[in-house]
Every structure is written in C-alpha cells, then in structure tokens.
C-alpha cells in the first residue's frame, strides 16, 4: 500500500493535491475533522472487534489494558498543548517551538512508558507476551503524539481540512493493516509491530507532502521552548490526571479481576466516548472562533455559543441513553461476539458518566480560552486522589458495577469543581477589564 501511495510519479502528485486542496475549506474542515476524529475514537473498537473474532476474550482484555495505558502516556507526549496551540491567536510561540517542545515531551513519554511497564510487570506478574504488547502499543501511540503538533499547526493556519484528511487516511490504512495482520497471522503482538512501523512511515510521507506548503522562516528560541512547556504544564497535568481518572477503574480491574472481565468492562465503556466524540465534531471547529470572540470582547456571542454547546451535550446524552436502553446490549454483544446482557445497567450508568465527561471537556476548553488553565490541575488533582483511593474499594466490593458507579461519581465531581472555577474566572476577568 505504501509503495502504491508513494509512487514518485503521478500517484504522489495526486495525493499531494488531494491533501492540500479543497473547494470549500470550511465544509471540508468539518467533514474531514469529523471523519478523522471518529476513526481515532473508534480505532480501539474496530481493533477489539477483530480481536474477539480472530483470537479470544483474554487477548481482548490484554488489548484493552494496553490501549488504556498507551493513551495515558500519550497525554505526556501531547502535553495538553493542542487547544493552547490552536487558540494562540497572538502567535506567542511559533510552530518550530511547538514542534521542538513536542519532541521533548514525546521522548519523556517513551521513558515513562518503559518505566511503567517494568514496574507493572513486576507487580502484576504479566506474561512476556502481555508486557511486549503494552510496550509496542506505547510505541504505536508515539506517532499520534508527533502528528498532533502538525495537525494543530494546520488548524492554526485555518486548514483543519488538511489535518482532517491526514488523520483520516492514516487511521483507515493503519486499522486495515492491523486487521489484516490479525486475520492472517493470528498474533496480536506481531500485528501491532507491523502496524506501528507502517503508521510511522505513513506519517513521514504525509508530513513530507503537506508541511512545505505551510513552512515559514522561523527560528527556535530555547528560552521560549521551556517557557511553552512551563505555560502548558498545568494543561498537561490536567490531561494526564483526567485520563487517569477516566481509566482508574480499568487499572483496579487489572489488579483485582481477570483479563476477561477487563475485556467486558472495556466493551461496555466504549459508548461512553461517543458522547464526547459527537460533541467534539461540533465544538472543535468553534475553538478558534470562540478564542477570537473572547479576545475581541464579544461576550454576548461567546456565551451564546457556550450555552448552545451545553444544550447539545444534554441532547446527545439523552439520545445515547435512550438508544443504549433499547439497543445497547444487543449491538455491543454482536460487535464484540460476547454476551453482555448481564451488564445492561452498568452500560447506562457509564453512558451518563460520559455526558458529564463531555461537559467537563467543554469547561476545560473554555478555561483554556480565557487563560485560567492553571486552575485545571487543582481540580483534576482532587478528583485523581479520590479515584486512586476509591477505585480498589469499589471494584473489590462491587466488581464491574462498582467500576461503573465510581466512574459516574468522579465525572460529576469533576464538573462541579470546574464549574465553580470557571465562574470565578469569568468574574475575575470582568473585574480586571
């Protein structure tokens, strides 16, 4: 596939033209961002569907933990910088400074991932195969970290369509290669290794084709790189703790229950992110617009969009709950080739938690736009401590139901804390003005 795409003749020029040109940039931005975000969100879902049909429930449980762990460390790589980069309308930092900082954080991501795997393997007595799957999943996600800096830059240049096309094509082809590997090799580790090498080469090709169109004569100032890392540290800490909070039940299940139960929890937790995903389709293109509104003190329009977004989250949550009540268990059981009838209540509880997850994500974005992001780490820190203390208690006593209820309670607490911080931030900004 790579050889066909990267043909130095006509095919390469066609691909370059496709990536860089859109008849209607705004329309293409929405469509391709939606497609790419959906594929990114459902990447694990599709992979799990193939695993449950080609391998077994144990392998699905290993994948669920590996994917959750890799995504946790991906937050170190991305450093919570995407929304800050896109909303940097004053161009406080240039792209080379964003990219240099991303290389630093990605190296840190790799180091921390390896340390975690060594500790977790020793503590939980992982098999060698499980250990290597987690390591390669972390390497697989490093590509997402590097790519995100370029996608953020293209979005900053009002070319979200280019970013969306890159992400969509890479996701489709990577999932295809991983799936074919599982079907023909029946080996999760080998399939993951092949997919990792493939997606790395794919990213290199896409960046080579697109970046020259946006390249500017810029220099990297070391002082500004460290300043960027300092400014975004609260965002990173918030993103890291947020992901830990959302996945704390999975880590407790890994320590206390079986890999098969881990797989079942992962199956019913999948729809949780649908709410945030659907909300992201609508809200992501609005970030730069709302940032400009805030900068130009168009408060009425700013708050109108804010309340519209809250309403949208509520509607999406209600629709998803209704759909899950009627079709959730049959559809998920069919998708994952597993009987999930005993987990219907847990599914509904988790989906409600997903609504509060989306709401907290909106609050986080608004706090970043109005530049009170330092407060986020405090809120996440409080809830993360609660998650660390309560996760083993809930899971040990109530198993999967305990994990589901705990998730909902943590999301509600997070929303309450952020709502208070946001209101204080608005009042402070008004008084400063």
Regions found by a protein language model. Give the residues of each.
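Membrane-interface junctions at transmembrane-helix termini in multi-pass inner-membrane proteins
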Residues: 23, 27, 83-94, 142-168, ...
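Signature of the first transmembrane helix
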Residues: 24-79, 110, 175, 233-260, ...
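Interfacial segments at transmembrane-helix termini and the short loops linking adjacent helices
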Residues: 58-60, 119-137, 259, 325-355
């Amino acid at each position: 596939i790579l050889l066909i795409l990267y043909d130095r003749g006509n095919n390469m020029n066609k691909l370059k033209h496709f990536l860089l040109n859109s008849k209607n940039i705004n329309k293409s931005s929405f469509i391709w961002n939606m497609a790419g975000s959906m594929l990114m969100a459902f990447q694990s879902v599709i992979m799990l569907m193939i695993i449950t049909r080609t391998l077994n429930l144990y392998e699905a449980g290993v994948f669920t933990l590996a994917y959750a762990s890799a995504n946790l460390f991906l937050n170190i790589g991305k450093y919570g910088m995407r929304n800050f980069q896109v909303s940097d309308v004053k161009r406080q930092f240039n792209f080379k400074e964003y990219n240099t900082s991303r290389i630093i954080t990605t190296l840190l991501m790799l180091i921390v991932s390896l340390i975690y795997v060594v500790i977790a393997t020793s503590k939980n007595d992982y098999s060698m195969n499980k250990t290597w799957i987690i390591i390669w999943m972390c390497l697989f996600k490093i590509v997402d970290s590097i790519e995100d800096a370029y996608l953020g830059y293209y979005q900053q240049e009002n070319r979200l369509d280019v970013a969306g096309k890159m992400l969509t094509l890479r996701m489709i082809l990577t999932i295809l290669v991983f799936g074919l590997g599982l079907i023909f090799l029946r080996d999760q580790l080998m399939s993951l290794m092949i997919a990792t090498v493939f997606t790395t080469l794919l990213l290199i090709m896409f960046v080579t084709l697109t970046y020259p169109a946006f390249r500017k004569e810029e220099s990297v100032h070391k002082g500004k790189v460290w300043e960027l890392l300092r400014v975004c540290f609260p965002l990173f800490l918030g993103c890291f703790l947020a992901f830990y909070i959302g996945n704390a039940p999975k880590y407790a299940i890994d320590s206390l229950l079986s890999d098969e139960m881990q797989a079942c929890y992962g199956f019913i937790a999948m729809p949780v992110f649908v709410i945030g995903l659907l909300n992201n389709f609508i809200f992501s293109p609005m970030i730069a617009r709302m940032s400009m509104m805030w900068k130009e003190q168009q408060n009425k329009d700013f708050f109108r969009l804010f309340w519209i977004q809250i309403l949208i989250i509520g509607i999406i949550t209600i629709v998803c709950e209704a759909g899950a009540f009627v079709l959730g268990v049959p559809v998920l059981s069919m998708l994952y080739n597993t009987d999930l009838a005993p987990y219907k209540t847990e599914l509904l509880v988790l989906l409600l938690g997903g609504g509060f997850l989306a709401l907290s994500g909106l609050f986080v974005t608004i706090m970043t736009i109005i530049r009170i992001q330092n407060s986020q780490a405090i809120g996440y820190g409080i809830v993360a401590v609660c998650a660390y203390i309560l996760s083993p208690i809930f899971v040990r006593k109530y198993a999967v139901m305990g994990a589901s209820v705990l998730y909902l309670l943590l999301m509600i607490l997070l929303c309450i804390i952020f709502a208070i911080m946001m209101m204080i931030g608005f009042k402070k900004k008004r008084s400063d003005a």
